[in-house]
A protein has these predicted regions:
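Helix-start/capping segments and mature chain N-termini
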Residues: 1-44, 61, 70-172
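Ordered, amphipathic secondary-structure segments that act as subunit-interaction surfaces
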Residues: 47-59
């Protein structure tokens, strides 16, 4: 998962942790830390950096494959691993770009990974499609990309949420 820290304060850390726990359950991963210990660890990492505005990333991986090939069929036979890092917060676009807007391109060459391939309700880092759509946008002179599903519906933008103002209503 990813959470931001602004002026020394985490943005909705508990909500991010709850989403992370749901994602782990959907992916059959076991977080080696309880929520309180996880929060203490993330706070400690940020404190060690001295950053007041940061991007905090953490994940649980399946871990190395068990030695016995048949054990790969059983999620409980893996030793899941927890990783986290903190880096300075970086805006995707500069203030001037955010004030006037940017040129978005709906990707023609790439679609978002279908939900029957990777459950979109589980936060994951399957991002090759997102990265390729960014390169497509750059090659076309656009500032950023938006992806669709296999039926042409907007899904997401790399590192961004999509909000549409239509007839006075905000859609997401």
């Amino acid at each position: 998962d990813v959470v931001t820290v602004s002026r020394g304060h985490f943005f909705r850390l508990k909500a991010h942790q709850e989403r992370f726990a749901r994602s782990c359950a959907r992916m059959k991963l076991t977080n080696p830390f309880e929520a309180e210990a996880e929060a203490r660890l993330l706070h400690k990492l940020v404190a060690k950096t001295g950053l007041r505005d940061a991007y905090v990333w953490w994940t649980v991986t399946r871990g190395a494959n068990p030695r016995v090939p048949a054990d790969r069929l059983h999620p409980d036979r893996f030793t899941n691993r927890f990783y986290a890092f903190v880096i300075p917060y970086v805006f995707i676009k500069e203030d001037t770009d955010r004030q006037v807007g940017i040129n978005l391109m709906v990707s023609r060459d790439y679609i978002r990974i279908p939900q029957n391939a990777v459950d979109p309700r589980a936060k994951n880092f399957c991002s090759l499609d997102l990265n390729m759509s960014l390169m497509e946008a750059g090659a076309s002179g656009a500032h950023w990309s938006v992806m669709t599903d296999g039926n042409g519906r907007l899904t997401e933008s790399p590192g961004s949420n999509i909000f549409i103002l239509k007839e006075g209503r905000i859609l997401t």
